């Protein structure tokens, strides 16, 4: 999410520096946050993000043709999850518990998983004089950066939570209609606060802008009001990943199903997308929108609709021997390099049912054993049927991400995430074998 010419705060020197190293004295600060001693907000980076202002367009065609769609569908094209739940109550209730549904939410005591209790609410940075305190106040929750040398501080309120907490969370705040990322995140794998990925070591700043592409993968709907790139219309921001991100705009479908004359007809309703009926490539494209690694937008955000060709919207950088797919963010690229993928017709949904909360790794093994005989495993002779639940741990182990890192006082932290290139990982297999043998 970092912008290459963003400005950073160095509280130790009590100045701000741009990326070229120029020092700019702080003289004033005017915003909603709690401030002391004249801290000022760094100048906003003005990025050239062309075509980000949506305009009203006609009702989306049921064939989801991408030829002329250069703007996002209007809010009126979307029915909302509540409308879906009226007929799909069971699916809706299960889906509410999934990481996708909870991928973004308002910041509350329930949605923020990091601790605000004494002894667990302080993030020590690589700068011994700089800490970030997590503060619960009557009017909300705050991140407060403190210079211990002189007790000067800069604080902003948690407004939006990004991430269900399955792996971690990052937090955003509003300054009027401008959206920014906060400097402290929470990682579940080490159960603690960390400097947000990409932030410099020993520094804290509150000026990392949230661009439309960020929200395209972490929200259901928004209206960009760029420039600057982080200006959004607050009253129509829909958090979480809702039904219509994978099924397409649903207003026409709801109207169809509510019609007394054609309700529940046997004829396929072409006004809604059933991903299971898409071709293999289009199914993969639906996931690739947010799980294809390094991409460059071709068209404005939210113009992609389920059933579209992703290459009309994103320029996807293919993996190479020098740039293999990382375990974070490029699950599709990794899967496509797997022999299981190239020798079958599998898609993401072969193993993942996005309507229900993910199972643990052991529960995925039956998907593997639907194609592979357990006796064909090289560890079968030594371990027998004990390996029946260990397919994923051996062939899709948890690996350290090279793309998502945090600069801590202990050094660079790398979160562990599930690999999606299915292959033999000798070290992982040996670890599983030792565990099963009690070694």
Identify the role of each PLM range.
Residues 10-13, 18, 22, 26, ...:
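Intrinsic-disorder-associated, low-complexity terminal segments enriched in Asp/Asn/His/Tyr and depleted
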Residues 32-44:
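Bacterial N-terminal signal peptides that target proteins for export
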Residues 43-54:
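Bacterial N-terminal signal peptides
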Residues 60-75, 82, 90-162, 170-172, ...:
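Primarily the internal scaffold of c-type cytochrome electron-transfer domains
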Residues 196-211, 220:
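Extended acidic/polar, glycine-enriched regions
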């Amino acid at each position: 999410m970092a912008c290459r010419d963003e400005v950073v705060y160095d509280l130790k020197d009590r100045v701000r520096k741009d990326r070229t190293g120029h020092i700019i004295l702080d003289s004033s600060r005017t915003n909603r946050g709690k401030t002391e001693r004249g801290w000022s907000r760094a100048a906003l980076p003005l990025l050239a993000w062309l075509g980000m202002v949506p305009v009203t367009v006609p009702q989306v065609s049921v064939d989801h043709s991408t030829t002329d769609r250069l703007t996002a569908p209007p809010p009126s094209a979307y029915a909302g999850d509540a409308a879906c739940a009226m007929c799909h109550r069971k699916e809706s209730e299960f889906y509410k518990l999934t990481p996708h549904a909870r991928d973004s939410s308002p910041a509350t005591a329930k949605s923020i998983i990091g601790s605000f209790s004494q002894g667990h609410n302080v993030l020590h940075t690589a700068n011994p004089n700089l800490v970030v305190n997590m503060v619960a106040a009557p009017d909300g929750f705050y991140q407060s950066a403190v210079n211990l040398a002189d007790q000067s501080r800069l604080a902003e309120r948690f407004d939006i939570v990004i991430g269900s907490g399955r792996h971690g969370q990052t937090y955003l705040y509003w300054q009027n209609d401008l959206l920014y990322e906060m400097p402290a995140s929470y990682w579940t794998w080490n159960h603690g606060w960390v400097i947000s990925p990409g932030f410099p070591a020993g520094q804290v700043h509150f000026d990392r802008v949230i661009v439309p592409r960020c929200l395209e993968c972490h929200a259901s709907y928004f209206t960009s009001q760029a420039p600057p790139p982080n200006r959004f219309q607050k009253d129509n921001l829909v958090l979480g990943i809702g039904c219509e991100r994978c099924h397409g705009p649903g207003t026409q479908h709801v109207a169809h199903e509510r019609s007394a004359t054609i309700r529940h007809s046997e004829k396929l309703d072409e006004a809604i997308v059933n991903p299971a009926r898409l071709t293999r490539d289009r199914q993969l494209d639906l996931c690739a929108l947010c799980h294809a690694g390094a991409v460059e937008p071709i068209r404005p955000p939210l113009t992609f609709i389920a059933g579209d060709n992703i290459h009309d919207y994103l320029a996807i950088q293919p993996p190479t021997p020098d740039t293999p797919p990382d375990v974070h963010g490029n699950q599709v690229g990794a899967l496509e390099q797997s022999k299981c993928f190239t020798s079958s017709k599998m898609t993401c949904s072969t193993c993942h049912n996005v309507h229900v909360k993910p199972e643990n790794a052991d529960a995925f093994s039956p998907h593997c054993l639907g194609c592979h005989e357990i006796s064909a495993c090289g560890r079968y002779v030594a371990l027998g049927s004990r390996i029946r639940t260990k397919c994923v741990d051996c062939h899709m182990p948890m690996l350290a991400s090279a793309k998502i890192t945090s600069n801590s006082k202990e050094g660079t932290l790398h979160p562990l995430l599930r690999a999606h290139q299915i292959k033999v990982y000798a070290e992982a297999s040996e670890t599983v074998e030792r565990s099963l043998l009690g070694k």
